[in-house]
Amino acid sequence: MKYILVTGGVISGIGKGVIASSVGTILKSSNLHVTSIKIDPYINIDAGTFSPYEHGEVFVLDDGGEVDLDLGNYERFLDIRLTKDNNLTTGKIYQSVINKERKGDYLGKTVQVVPHITEAIQEWVMRQALIPVDEDGIEPEVCVIELGGTVGDIESMPFVEAFRQFQFKARRENFCNIHVSLVPQPSATGEQKTKPTQNSVRELRGLGLSPDLVVCRCSTPLDTSVKEKISMFCHVEPQQVICVHDVSSIYRVPLLLEEQGVVDYFRQRLDLPIGRQPRRLLMKWKEMADRYERLLESCSIALVGKYTKFSDSYASVIKALEHSALAINHRLEIKYIDSADLEQETLQEEPVRYHEAWQKLCSSDGILVPGGFGVRGTEGKIQAIAWARKQKKPFLGVCLGMQLAVVEFARDVLDWKDANSTEFNPKTSHPVVIDMPEHNPGQMGGTMRLGKRRTIFHSQNSVMKKLYGGHEYVEERHRHRYEVNPELRRELEARGLKFVGQDTEGERMEIVELEDHPYFVGVQYHPEFLSRPIKPSPPYFGLLLASVGRLSQYIERGCRLSPRDTYSDRSENSSPDAEIAELKLPMIDHE
């Protein structure tokens, strides 16, 4: 097993996750099996109870693990399936060690950070690195480990010490350290400054880890003189200083690393069995990056939510929209709308914000209401859904978005004026959305319906069934505490709101579609978690197709994209990558 540790310096949030994912991508393109581990030095057991403002979205895995959004990057880049143990936190490690101490496993010894915590970290990494993450079930050959935070933080000290020890346990030919650092370029002088990187590497080396590659994040390509200066002061060769400057899309990052000889370096440094033949996967990434820059037409989607000021709160949703837009060769324009701005209260207090929000909504090609929690902004979301339904505007509701679509329909079409979710009004006389029996209101963490679940289609004419390739069932990831009230299903369906997908018991409403509408779909699960750059999520793909007026044509063609639909350059000589043109949908295992 080969281990590649990715650390960061100067500031957090400089792209360690994308760089770690890109390293994994170029290794996977060399026919290696790659897995990833993300280490978060916070004391929380997992990311499940985080506020989206605090830490971005909570990414959900097949096994129900609520983890850091960087694991979403790993899954999308590498097309792998991770588990909750691929996200290691200080809380998990301390909980594990304390449980052992309570059982008497340490035989009365004084339990300390060194050696007990550090050894537990190493054991966790070695154990998890061997778990297969690819569909073929083959054991990984390379494990890319991202250490969150910045070097020197008090929180990350036990992890840095653990890897200082681990480099000797794994042996030099099996362990490599990539250090990601910022090279700022003040606008006043325009000069690239190396001092922050020098100090960061010096601190890392003082803690016992010496970087093999120094990856410099900068706004423009590094000057040769700057590379040489970093090389001299950071104790590395000039070819070990890698520049990752700002690029048009993240699809360019693996290509940037490959161009600078990172694969050749790993071949020698880690003695990896990598040939010199052209790498087909990277050719696909290059094709995607080139296509992204050639897009001529655009499609606007209104994202109506309550966390719109912080785009990381909807990271996977945004990626799923981007994947779908790229598949039909349209540039995506997302219009972020705070749902509270659509409410009558805002009209009274801030009429300008109210009218600006409605102008954004009305001028969009499609509307998306993603998942969320809490009562704030829900009436605004319901107003947006009502507008989409009445104006025949393509609409997708995810999780809470689906629940509110049912609430809006019940209020307006069935004339149940007080219809609501018991989450927002426990005393409503028409509880259209109710809490599930499994829900434990006394405890927040891990009490939701989580992870991969099967949804059975109950309608042959369902648009969603066609978008999923005509399969009898699909398996998608869930994260919710509330569900549509199954007792009201018959009354809702009688008026045209069809529940075309249910769980395996037929009790939980999973997919809803509205009759006589171009595209009005709600899904209880979160399809964005399984969207991939070359395999867009069907619900999001349907929204984009409907928004550009091509959904009917796509379905008539047997759910296949024509070359004309998938290429922005309309010249006769253009021909798209066939593998992207004929859209790949997520693999479904039939037992």
Swiss-Prot record:
Residues 562-572 have a biased composition (Basic and acidic residues). Residues 562-581 are annotated as: Disordered. Pathway: Pyrimidine metabolism; CTP biosynthesis via de novo pathway; CTP from UDP: step 2/2. Its EC number is 6.3.4.2. The active site is at C399, H526, E528. One of its GO terms (biological process) is CTP biosynthetic process. PROSITE patterns: GATASE_TYPE_1 (PS51273). It catalyses: UTP + L-glutamine + ATP + H2O = CTP + L-glutamate + ADP + phosphate + 2 H(+). CDD domains: CTPS_N, GATase1_CTP_Synthase. InterPro entries: Class_I_gatase-like, CTP_synthase, CTP_synthase_N, GATASE, GATase1_CTP_Synthase, P-loop_NTPase. GO terms for cellular component: cytoophidium; cytoplasm. Residues 300-554 form the Glutamine amidotransferase type-1 domain. NCBIfam families: PRK05380.1, PyrG. Belongs to the CTP synthase family. This enzyme is involved in the de novo synthesis of CTP, a precursor of DNA, RNA and phospholipids. Catalyzes the ATP-dependent amination of UTP to CTP with either L-glutamine or ammonia as a source of nitrogen. This is CTP synthase 1-B.
